């Protein structure tokens, strides 16, 4: 389903449904004497994290997931996400039975999966954490699965972002915190009483130390190297640079111009030891093929759509640098030690910047940037993304040389 369709449904169907279900939830809770505050001695049977929109955010949520497991070691932790997130969660340590997928490509598929998920949590004591601020379908899911604790970011006196009365534990959305800190605060709120508002009245430190780290074995690394040599015997793999020229359809404005990637690639190949590998999804194969052929088909490998998620992480672990738009690979690569050069424009790196200590962000910081946020469903009226276009090839090349010691 196209992101704009999802936005329309979330707004025009989500607002009235949130209002009606919020009223129903308020009436139900007023009649109940059951407490929604848990202690470690009286923990929820199940803790559910909900994140449907961007797969890269799943990796960012890792410290929060670990915090929930630490607080309630006897509780089962589940994750509800879109179908594309399954491999990511498996590599994060979730079992297949703990991953609940929603097919967001069609309305009928989504409804079918919602019914299945509802059955999974019947008669269970559930706490639900909504990772995505002000996404109504995610907030509604907490009520749909019967969660008595429903934790998320709330608008309070802000305009927009209406969620009705769905959340029991309401946190202020702080746009000065990195997303990993916001998610961590949501997990910490599991033990907070209902009487405290707004949450969370604690300082949340940087979560870079607690980020997901994926160790790829030497055998797996060698298997991928052998595969690359077998498929491309004419190309030396002395120094590998990865280019991710794409961004999801959620915010296409995040793309650096393709002609800039072409110019950068040609300049990089002046160094004979460098091989360029282009990464991307299966849907991006054709565009990536054009890019690879335009740069230099003899020294550029189009690897888009040819890896599993684990193989992509393995590719990061054997490569020397990733140059990428603001997109999922920023976060996937942060699970390894690969140096990352991330290009940011319409969204601020303060919230979704790379969590790796080996990362550098390039941003022009125009007056109009950032123009997308959780308050506008990441939808901008921009018709000319100068925030990306004004990132020059020279700026990027200078940083690449620093990483490579040129």
Which residues fall in each region the model found?
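Catalytic machinery of carbohydrate-active enzymes
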Residues: 1-406
């Amino acid at each position: 389903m196209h992101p704009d369709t999802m936005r329309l449904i979330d707004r025009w169907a989500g607002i009235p449904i949130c209002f009606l279900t919020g009223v129903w939830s308020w009436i139900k809770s007023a009649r109940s004497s059951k407490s929604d505050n848990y202690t470690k001695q009286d923990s929820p049977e199940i803790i559910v994290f909900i994140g449907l929109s961007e797969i890269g955010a799943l990796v960012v949520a890792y410290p929060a997931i670990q915090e929930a497991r630490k607080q309630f070691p006897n509780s089962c932790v589940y994750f509800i996400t879109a179908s594309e997130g399954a491999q990511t969660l498996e590599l994060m340590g979730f079992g297949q039975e703990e991953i609940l997928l929603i097919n967001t490509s069609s309305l009928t598929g989504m409804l079918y999966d919602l019914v299945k998920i509802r059955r999974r949590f019947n008669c269970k004591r559930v706490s639900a954490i909504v990772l995505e601020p002000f996404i109504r379908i995610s907030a509604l899911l907490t009520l749909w699965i019967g969660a008595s604790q429903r934790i998320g970011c709330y608008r309070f006196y802000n305009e927009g972002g209406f969620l009705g009365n769905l959340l029991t534990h309401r946190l202020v959305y702080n746009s000065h915190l990195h997303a990993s800190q916001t998610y961590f605060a949501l997990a910490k709120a599991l033990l907070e009483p209902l009487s405290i508002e707004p949450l969370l009245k604690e300082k949340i430190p940087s979560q870079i130390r607690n980020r997901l780290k994926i160790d790829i074995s030497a055998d797996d690394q060698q298997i991928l190297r052998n595969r690359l040599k077998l498929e491309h015997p004419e190309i030396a793999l002395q120094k590998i640079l990865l280019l991710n020229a794409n961004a999801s359809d959620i915010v296409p404005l995040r793309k650096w111009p393709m002609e800039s990637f072409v110019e950068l690639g040609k300049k990089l190949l002046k160094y004979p030891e460098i091989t360029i590998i282009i990464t991307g999804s299966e849907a991006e194969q054709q565009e990536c093929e054009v890019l690879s052929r335009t740069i230099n088909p003899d020294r550029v490998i189009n690897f888009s759509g040819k890896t599993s998620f684990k193989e992509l992480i393995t590719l990061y672990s054997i490569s020397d640098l990733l140059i990428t738009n603001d997109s999922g690979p920023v976060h996937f690569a942060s699970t390894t030690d690969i140096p990352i050069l991330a290009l940011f424009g319409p969204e601020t790196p303060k919230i979704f910047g790379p969590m790796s200590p080996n990362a550098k962000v390039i941003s022009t910081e125009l007056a109009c940037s950032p123009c997308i946020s959780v308050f506008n469903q990441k939808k901008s009226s921009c018709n000319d993304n100068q925030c990306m276009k004004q990132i020059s090839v020279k700026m990027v090349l200078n940083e690449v040389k620093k990483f490579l010691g040129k």
